[in-house]
Swiss-Prot record:
The lineage of its organism: Bacteria, Bacillati, Bacillota, Bacilli, Bacillales. Keywords: Cell wall biogenesis/degradation, Cytoplasm, Phosphopantetheine, Phosphoprotein. Residues 1-78 form the Carrier domain. Belongs to the DltC family. GO terms for molecular function: D-alanyl carrier activity. GO terms for cellular component: cytoplasm. It comes from Bacillus licheniformis (strain ATCC 14580 / DSM 13 / JCM 2505 / CCUG 7422 / NBRC 12200 / NCIMB 9375 / NCTC 10341 / NRRL NRS-1264 / Gibson 46). The keyword Phosphoprotein applies. This is D-alanyl carrier protein. The gene is dltC. The modification O-(pantetheine 4'-phosphoryl)serine is found at S36. PROSITE patterns: CARRIER.
Length: 78
């Protein structure tokens, strides 16, 4: 599985919704798929799975609002 697919799998697991795999441009916050508690859980999951740390203080919701944006941000941090 490539990195992008792994990110989508982790995201789907945390969101408990496969729509993030089916529609990578869906706004996960606008659609209520992920809330602030879920965001913290997601960042911890990324740290655990990929050893990528995203400080919550540097988390900009507008830059992380879709699966494609999340993949882009994580690729930049790798």
């Amino acid at each position: 599985m490539d990195f992008n697919q792994e990110v989508l799998s982790v995201l789907a697991e945390v969101c408990q919704d496969d729509i993030v795999k089916e529609n990578p441009d869906i706004d996960i916050f606008e659609e209520g798929i992920l809330d602030s508690f879920g965001t913290v859980e997601l960042l911890l999951a990324f740290e655990s799975h990929f050893n990528i740390t995203v400080p919550i203080t540097e988390f900009d919701r507008d830059a992380w609002n879709t699966p494609n944006q999340i993949i882009k941000q994580l690729n930049e941090l790798r």
